[in-house]
Each structure stands twice: as structure tokens, then as C-alpha cells.
Amino acid sequence: MYAKLNEFEEKVIRGITEDRWLKLATELIKTGQPRACDPLDPDLPSGEEEAIAMLVAGKLEALGMEVNMYESQPHRPNIVGILKGSGSGPVLMMNDHMDTYPVVEPHKWDKTNFKPFKATRAGDLLYARGSSDTRGNLACTILAAQALVENGIKLKGDLMYCFCVDEERDGTHGSIYLTKEIGIKADYSITAEPTAYGGDATKGDWGMNLSIANGGHCLIEVTLEGDKAHIWRPDTSNNAIVELAKLISHLEIMPFTHEITEFMGHTPPCTTIVRIRGGLPGEMQFSPDSCTVTLAVVGIVPGMTLESIILDIENEVKSFIGERKDITYKVNQVKDCLL
């Protein structure tokens, strides 16, 4: 049972309509794209969120907010807007990010007529890159502030809007920069991120649950090295691709050393295979002597460290290799990828 809304709450809710949201979300989704696409892949260039940042900064200023921009990389400004409260109440932060996943295969975007940044409605769903993660959510947060202002409602404490860059790439130039270098802080924070586990995917509400904590992740590379041989003599080599393919089945189900924490979530510490590389251009006459798999280690909880994660993976690899002397291995964190 939901609590009865008071007069002020009813006024705010009435100001947040579907038509308003759809119009604003459609505008936000297309702005600055595809430049704002920000891949996690450390070997690809990061995005630039400048265009979308300037747009949302203008919208916050139009609501009477004091707006500041902070950037640690050119063309990547973080936006911080403050709607002053009426007294000395706690500061509430509304947090969201302005970068999105990249679009690698636009020919598969049939729901949007192969235009990934064109918001396209189908029934109760809105399709486009960023509609869920998180331009549609961004629209919700802005409309909430607009509804407050339109109805002359002031919170006791300041309402802070913090729109970050670089979220998809671990936040070095976004939330981490703002908190550690600029000193941004609040008493409470609501993050409009749609990836809360626990919804019912069959009903279309996956990612719609509330979460009160967030696990970590990191990228780890595992390389096996064997022997190179001519393709007509596979019996004389230890094909690194073949050996790594066998190892992957072990890495997929391996356990990680960790303690049960107060908030474990629905994803325990585990691995997801995200990339595999083997063989060199111009050497298809030979079996490859080296192959590398990239693992996303997800569900990291307090107490786990980079060292403990690498040690667990090394032990799994050692168990797989056993006493064999014809295969060697390396395990390391992907460069510039945070824990």
C-alpha cells in the first residue's frame, strides 16, 4: 500500500507528464551523438559529452539553478547545478551520467529504422541508444526539478544535480574526479541508473528495482603461450587458442575468495568473458603460440582486492595447467582499467 500523497507531492506529480517526458527524452537522446558514446574498451578512444552537457546546463540554468562545469579532460565537462533550499536541511543529490554505450552494429537497430539515436516509440516502450541508460532517466530528473520550480516549492535543503561524464568507462573523469578532486558531496544521493538487478524480465521491468549499494568490476587479461607449428603438423604444437578455449570453461565457473557482506546483491563475484584474441595477421600457415582472453570480473564486494582477484585467477590457471611444462601463462589487470 502506498502512502497518501500530500498537497505538494500531488502538484509535483501532476507536472511530470508522459508527453513532457517523451519530448525531453527524445531531445536528450539524440544530442551530441555519436560523440558521447564511451566504450569500456581501454584500447578505444573515450567519448566527448560536451554537446549534451551544454544542453542540460542550459536547462538547469533556466530553472534558476546555480550551474558550474568541471572537467579534467577537454570537451568532457561535468555539470553541477544547485537549486537552493529554504533553510538548513540536508543536501539531496540527483545523479546521472551523460555518456552512453557505443553503437557498433547500427544495421541491427530495426526498431528505430536503423537509426540508433532516433527515439522511436512502440507501445509503452521507447527504443534508442540511451533511452534507458540513461538519457530517458536524465529527462525524469530534470522534469522533477521543473515541477518543483513551477509550483513554487522549495526544499529545506539544497537540491544538487550532478550530471557526470565517463560513467561507462569507470568514472575517472566523472564521479571520481568530482568527489576526490573537486570535493562534491551531499547528505543523500539518488542515482538514476537502470541496472538494478531483480526485476522480472518477462514483464519488461528488469532494471526497475531500487538498489542501495553497488558492486565493483575490473578487467583482467589471461594469456596462454604454447608452441607454434605449421598448420599441417598440429600434432607437433600446443595450439594456444585450443588450450585457452579449454581453460575458459573453468574461468567461467571459478569461485572468488570473499566474505559475505551486508548487501551482496544478486550477482556474486564471478567472471564474464568479453574478448578473445589469438593468431597474428599473415601467419595463418601456423598454429598460434599465444592467445589472450579478457575477463570482466563483476560483483566485487568490500574486502576483495586486485591482488586477491589475480591470485584466485592464477590458482585456477595453475590447476588447469597442472604439471605441463609446454604451456606458460600470464595474468594481469587491463591497463587503465580501475578496480
Report each predicted region and the residues it spans.
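Metal-dependent amide/peptide-bond hydrolase catalytic core
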Residues: M1-D19, E48-A51, A62, G199-G204, ...
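Short secondary-structure junctions
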Residues: G64-Y70, K118-A119, K330-N332
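A structural signal for isolated positions on well-ordered beta-strands in alpha/beta enzyme cores
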Residues: N68, M93, M160-C162, K330
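Hydrophobic/aromatic beta-strand patches that form the interior of the parallel beta-sheet core
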Residues: P90-M94, C162, Y188-I190, T272-V274, ...
